[in-house]
Amino acid sequence: MAVAYADKPNHFINFPLTQFEGFVLNYKGLQFQLLDEGVDCKIQTAPHISLAMLDIQPEDYRSVDVAIQEVIDDMHWGEGFQIKFDNPLILGRCIVLDVKGVEELHDDLVNYIRDKGCVADQSRKWIGHCTIAQLTDAALSIKENVDFINSMQFNYKITINPSSPARLEIVKLGAEKKDGFYETIVSHWMGIRFEYNPPTDKLAMIMGYCCLEVVRKELEEGDLPENDDDAWFKLSYHYENNSWFFRHVYRKSSYFRKSCQNLDCNCLGFYESPVEED
């Protein structure tokens, strides 16, 4: 089956960098050097890494949202990982920093999003980078500008661990920027989410069940639609959109997860009441 590529993207997975103050201080230092040298360019005001380009519609947001959460919950942190930013270079019309350390994250995001049936990544090879500025056509044609950019020095590392402020976001191309960040559709903290308290007692009661009849007995009358397919869909909605429910069902009850996804009971009669003998 041919792979569909986002060669005409309309969204991207964003890794914002504004919250890393030490990096931003050095990043802005590079931008100041460009302006001080008189290089005609448009400065990037929302430093970030584009981890994957997407060709999706609003009805795909939920699927991509869940894929991002699955990537985060499947991460093997250890002591964390480092993102390394190296000397500026010219990529197309942009002045960018070379970025290393997020290749595996890029691959995971693309694979998980594609598994949801959504279009991710482009046919050309993905190159990790962080844009500093965009050159005008006139500036790009001036040899002195190119020589100056190639002479600029930059070397910085960010350590990403469960307590760092790293986030993964869905951003629409052309989204507004404010205070160094893009307007987002979805934004998730990447840290390990140690939350063991259910948001409601009802979700706590049904977590782990894979029989709709038993779920209905645990909940109050009217909590679920009478139609079985509609009831499973409601449970699936909670599974995909409630982070506590998602994490605990994902980790502790594969049967319930499959039931939600298939809108069907997987209990095989195991939850039926035993017949009392005379």
Curated annotation (Swiss-Prot):
Origin superkingdom: Viruses
- Pfam families, alphabetically? Corona_NS2A
**InterPro entries xref list:** Coronavirus_NS2A, NS2A-like
Q: Which family does it belong to?
A: Belongs to the coronaviruses ns2a protein family.
Q: What is this protein called?
A: Non-structural protein 2a
Which organism is this protein's natural source? Bovine coronavirus (strain Mebus)
